[in-house]
C-alpha cells in the first residue's frame, strides 16, 4: 500500500495530443507517468478527494484524466474505490465523478454500507464522523475481500472473454463543409 498525494502538485491537464498512443506514455513527463507504472502493477486503486463546489480537486482530475487516458495497460478487474470528504454537501456528485474513471475501464468498484464519504472541513474534524469512519472501515474490508475474490477467480476461471472495442463517433469526421 502506498499513499501518493497529488492535490498540491503542479499537474497539467490532458491536451488530447495523441502522443501517448505513439510513445506509450503522456507527453508531459511528470508524476502521472510514474503513477501509471505503479497502477499497472497494483491490484486496486483508491482515489480520495476533498469536495470543492460538488467536484473533486481539479489537480486530481487532471491527474486522473491523463492517467486513465494515457496508460494503455488492461485495467479490467483491478478494483477501484473512491472516497470523498466534505464539510457538508457535494459528496454524491464527487463520488460519482471519481467512479466514472473505474467503470469506463472495466474496473469493479468496491462499495461500503453507504456512499464512500466522510465529513469534516479542517484536519481532524472527520474523526468526529462515526458513521463516516465506519463506512471507511467497511470499505477497506470489502475492497480487500473483492481483490482476493478476483484473484481466486482469475486462478480458477481466468478473466472474462473480451471483445475488440467498437468505437462510435456521433459526429462525422469529414470537415469539408467548413471550406
Identify the function of each model-found stretch.
Residues 123-133, 140:
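Residues forming the flavin
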Residues 5-12, 103-123:
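Mobile beta-alpha loop/short-helix "lid" or hinge segments that flank ligand
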Residues 27-114:
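Helix-loop-strand module that forms the ligand-binding subsite of alpha/beta enzymes
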Residues 140-155:
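Short, hydrophobic alpha-helical segments
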Residues 7-25:
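N-terminal beta-loop-helix "entrance" segment that forms/cooperates
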Residues 155-174:
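A short, charged, Gly/Pro-tolerant segment at domain boundaries
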Residues 176-179:
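Conserved small/polar residues in nucleotide/adenosyl-binding loops
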